[in-house]
A protein has these predicted regions:
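Amphipathic alpha-helical effector-binding/dimerization core
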Residues: 10-105
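Juxtadomain coupling helices with adjacent low-complexity linkers
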Residues: 161-210
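Short, basic/aromatic recognition patches
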Residues: 32-41, 105-150, 189, 197
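Short clusters of small/polar residues that mark proteolytic maturation junctions
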Residues: 63-65, 141, 165
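Sensor-regulatory modules in signal-transduction proteins
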Residues: 153-156
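Beta-hairpin "wing" of winged helix-turn-helix
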Residues: 1-5, 10
Length: 210
């Protein structure tokens, strides 16, 4: 559903299940994250997503649409099995334990585009690179013509429980490194700040599958 005041979209049916994964109410978490998503949206004008996982499924908790005339328009496309093909999914996968990764990736890796990494060995190299760099990208791996940047949100045990990603038409960033850097810096800042809030309000950090 859409909150008409904030213009954000939410998956209402997912909130209860997300609350069972973390140690405080999902509404509280999403409400706190909202202004940070809005800030990214204001700075970049691009679509912004707050994501997490439900078992082995990737779920979108909140989304802000792009404000640009030419924009990414994918709404709530089904990303349940797209952990390996999205910046939001890979940003979490790269920092999970090996056991959690294997559980999520045990099935067939669906190929969404010609750029989707659906080979486990190649994906492993990609996740190692993400772990080293601290962020993930999706270069037309989920949707043709779309480039995304995603950062993990960590709990007080440095385990990823959510992620923020920003999506842009690829042509806008191909020859504009400054624009890409602006996207990365705004998403990184928000992911860190939201993580700080989680660490202050949650001292258990052991209920999720990271």
């Amino acid at each position: 559903y859409q909150d008409l005041k904030s213009k954000r979209y939410f998956l209402g049916s997912k909130l209860k299940k997300f609350s069972e994964v973390i140690d405080f109410k999902a509404n509280e978490f999403i409400s706190y994250a909202g202004p940070f998503l809005k800030k990214i949206n204001d700075i970049t004008g691009e679509a912004v997503h707050l994501a997490s996982f439900e078992g082995t499924k990737l779920i979108t908790l909140s989304m802000l649409e792009s404000t640009h005339p030419v924009r990414v328009d994918h709404g709530f496309l089904n990303k349940d099995n797209a952990f390996h093909a999205t910046a939001s999914g890979k940003a979490m996968l790269a920092f999970m334990t090996e056991a959690s990764k294997k559980k999520i990736l045990k099935g067939r890796l669906e190929k969404f585009t010609n750029h989707t990494i659906n080979n486990l060995e190649h994906l492993s190299f990609e996740l190692d690179k993400i772990n080293k760099n601290g962020f993930a990208t999706d270069d037309e791996e989920f949707q043709p013509g779309v480039f995304c940047v995603g950062f993990p949100i960590f709990d007080n045990q440095q385990k990823p429980f959510a992620s923020i990603s920003c999506s842009s038409p690829k042509f806008k960033i191909i020859n504009d490194k400054k624009y890409l850097d602006k996207i990365k810096s705004s998403v990184k800042f928000s992911a860190i700040e939201i993580g700080k809030y989680f660490k202050k309000t949650n001292n258990k950090g052991d209920k999720h599958a990271a």
